Amino acid sequence: MLPSTIQTLTLFLTSGGVLLSLYVSASLSYLLYSDILLKFSPKITAPTMTLDCTNASNVQAVNRSATKEMTFLLPEPEWTYPRLSCQGSTFQKALLISPHRFGEARGNSAPLIIREPFIACGPKECKHFALTHYAAQPGGYYNGTREDRNKLRHLISVKLGKIPTVENSIFHMAAWSGSACHDGREWTYIGVDGPDSNALIKIKYGEAYTDTYHSYANNILRTQESACNCIGGDCYLMITDGSASGISKCRFLKIREGRIIKEIFPTGRVEHTEECTCGFASNKTIECACRDNNYTAKRPFVKLNVETDTAEIRLMCTETYLDTPRPDDGSITGPCESNGDKGRGGIKGGFVHQRMASKIGRWYSRTMSKTERMGMELYVKYDGDPWTDSDALDPSGVMVSIKEPGWYSFGFEIKDKKCDVPCIGIEMVHDGGKKTWHSAATAIYCLMGSGQLLWDTVTGVDMAL
């Protein structure tokens, strides 16, 4: 279907000369597309005109002005596909969004109290998403802001680089779990809320609420807390439903223009998979590094074939264990599928691909502390298979020191003109406990240049102020 973006070029021809008038209606954002359809419709008008003549009594003058209208219909933008990554061999500190450095502001300029931030990008812009408690700091509604789920939480966004304040934020839907992605034409927003025993996934495409998906295990249906992934108009979303301390089997929803068109049921090691961070390894395969909150400190690793719409899960085999809490690296014996110990509890992990012509890099993040959500390091592994490679990952630098909070982390890609820039974001939580506000900053590191990762990030926030 063609969009409403129309350009009308009207050429008025008169005996006194040529008047060219260009009318542009709606948006010019799609001018980069070259296919143009032309439609001509003739119009005839007869304006009055005075003529000078020496013998005017014997002359009757008639003027005709002919109008030709040309209507330019611009086609819709293209669906997005993964491209090769932009050049680079290291990540560097790109951006810090620390809203509560502005905590003295009040009213519409006050920063929202948020958690679970993530970033998703379309062809023209990136959005910084989060789940708010419908409260700001300073304010009088701090009670309950440490809760994961309640009736006040909403999925919000700002343009990346903006501070998520009351006036800057767009409230998309009521939600205590969320995701979002851009298919090249429009945004898809995902929100989950409702009672633990009967939660509901809601889908919004652009400004329209388009579809829902009901709980299948009646135990906190939830989604990934990071961007879903789109290719050729199809967007893939990871969901799970089940006990945080037991079985929680994930599924993938295939969504097109805001409507669910298929459910995908992974095979393999499916006991517990949640909070997946996913991205494209190629035009054929989505890969996800996920969280097992009950059985192991290894990350469940998903491979989803978008040509066959099939998915399989196995544990990562590397001796660098990526969850928190975790045992000492290399201490788990036995085959790759061995769970090991210290598997209770967990944290969402950052993961992003570096797609190159001759090889692929997989970048991961994990906390510096083995037991606490403190600090964040970056790791990389080129080529190989995460299911079978037992070698250690290569450390690539400290993004957050062990003295600073490092909670959830996630991956995303910024779209340059001809390539994609892989990035990792880190949630740095201000944990005020149950007696005061509980919110987060976001640190962002992206692939750029060469050398070594140079500097870590601090929030600069003192909750006692």
Curated annotation (Swiss-Prot):
Disulfide bonds join C86-C419, C121-C126, C181-C228, C230-C235, C276-C290, C278-C288, C317-C336, C423-C446. Residues 13-35 are annotated as: Involved in apical transport and lipid raft association. Residues 1-11 are intravirion. InterPro entries: Glyco_hydro_34, Sialidase_Influenza_A/B, Sialidase_sf. Its cofactor is Ca(2+). It is an enzyme of class 3 (hydrolase). It holds the Pfam family Neur. Glycans are attached at N55, N63, N143, N283, N294. It catalyses: Hydrolysis of alpha-(2->3)-, alpha-(2->6)-, alpha-(2->8)- glycosidic linkages of terminal sialic acid residues in oligosaccharides, glycoproteins, glycolipids, colominic acid and synthetic substrates. It is found in: Virion membrane; Host apical cell membrane. Ca(2+) binds at D292, D323. The chain crosses the membrane at residues 12-34. It is a single-pass type II membrane protein. Keywords: Calcium, Disulfide bond, Glycoprotein, Glycosidase, Host cell membrane, Host membrane, Hydrolase, Membrane, Metal-binding, Signal-anchor, Transmembrane, Transmembrane helix, Virion. Residues 88-465 are annotated as: Head of neuraminidase. N-glycosylated. The influenza B genome consist of 8 RNA segments. Genetic variation of hemagglutinin and/or neuraminidase genes results in the emergence of new influenza strains. The mechanism of variation can be the result of point mutations or the result of genetic reassortment between segments of two different strains. Catalyzes the removal of terminal sialic acid residues from viral and cellular glycoconjugates. Cleaves off the terminal sialic acids on the glycosylated HA during virus budding to facilitate virus release. Additionally helps virus spread through the circulation by further removing sialic acids from the cell surface. These cleavages prevent self-aggregation and ensure the efficient spread of the progeny virus from cell to cell. Otherwise, infection would be limited to one round of replication. Belongs to the glycosyl hydrolase 34 family. This is Neuraminidase.
